[in-house]
Amino acid sequence: MSQFTFTRAPFPQTRMRRLRAQEFSRRLVQETVLTPADLIYPMFVLEGENRREAIPSMLGIERVSIDQLLLEAAELVTLGIPAVALFPVTPPEAKSLLAEEAWNTNGLAQRAVRALKQHFPQLGVITDVALDPFTTHGQDGIIDDNGYVINDVTTQALIKQAL
């Protein structure tokens, strides 16, 4: 027989809250603190000037032209968000079977990165090394006549894009 007498039911019916009693102890044992400095803001960029286009499947999110991208980036920097992830909307006429637009130095993604780094050198700019935005077929690789990804050719294309 135990020398202790419980006035409450044992665990799990009663769970003590002692670690949550004081604000300082709640901070010490909390799992996660999320601040703007922990965020990466996704941005969808399209060709043109002074353009904003709603993305129907993503309420409140827009595709923006580079000039509008810079306006939004200024606000993000002010808010303390340290990085953006860019997703280009490649015009259909720039897409090809071999995804050459992926490494075009004057391509939309490349111009957007340069503009952001010129105006906001402290802002982290993340891009996706992927070919699907640049291929006419939408595959994330260079395909053969049967629709299979040709790995060696795709790898070389991804290397060109990354550099």
Predicted regions and their residues:
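Alpha/beta enzyme core
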Residues: 2-10, 22, 35-40, 46-163
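Acidic, Ser/Thr/Pro-rich intrinsically disordered transcriptional activation regions
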Residues: 17-18, 23-25
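Short clusters of hydrophobic/aromatic residues that line enzyme substrate/ligand-binding pockets
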Residues: 28-29, 58
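N-terminal intrinsically disordered, cationic/polar leader segments
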Residues: 15, 30-31, 36
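N-terminal start-of-chain detector that recognizes signal peptides
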Residues: 11-17
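Short, flexible, glycine/charge-rich loop motifs used to bind or transfer phosphoryl groups or to couple energy/partner
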Residues: 29-30, 155
